[in-house]
Amino acid sequence: LIERLKEPNKNCWSPIGGKLEMRLGESPFECAIRETREEIGLEISEGDLHLFSMISEKAYEGSCHWLMFLFDCKKRIDSLPRNISEGSFAFFEYGEIMSGRIKIPETDRTLLWNIWEKHRDGMVVLRADCGNILTSKIEQVI
């Protein structure tokens, strides 16, 4: 995980990721490959990735609407990546992430990591409303 130095999720531990280069017509897979290379220096291909979730998030941080594509990367790393301008890295076990001992975004604790734990070998489509009270609805499980 990366301890983010910038918004969104500043000062929280989060999976690596980023935004699609929409003006270039970048696909979610191309974005995941690029962000992995940029953030941790790992060269991967589409075959290293498994898309396990698509989440539509309404009112994230009270204002914006996000469409997230969550991937599990089958290619593993042995050592921590070098620190980057966006933050520093650490390895954590799933139980440690969910324990509350490390600071992660509430939406990650409530949704993202539970989805990873239950559906990382399949596919789930989910809609979340991050308004005053976080609500979510699974729309499809494959």
Predicted segments — roles?
Residues 1, 68-72, 91:
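Conserved hydrophobic/aromatic beta-strand scaffold that supports enzyme active sites
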Residues 1-15, 44, 50:
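N-terminal strand-loop-strand
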Residues 16, 32, 36:
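Hydrophobic alpha-helical positions that pack around
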Residues 20, 44, 55, 75-76, ...:
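Hydrophobic pocket-lining residues within nucleotide cofactor-binding pockets
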Residues 21-31:
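N-terminal phosphate-binding loop and adjacent alpha-helix
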Residues 57-80, 109, 113-119:
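Active-site-adjacent beta-strand/loop module that shapes the phosphate/pyrophosphate-binding cleft
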Residues 81-115, 136-141:
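NUDIX/MutT-family hydrolases
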Residues 115-142:
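Charged phosphate-binding loop/patch that engages nucleotide di/tri-phosphates or the phosphate backbone
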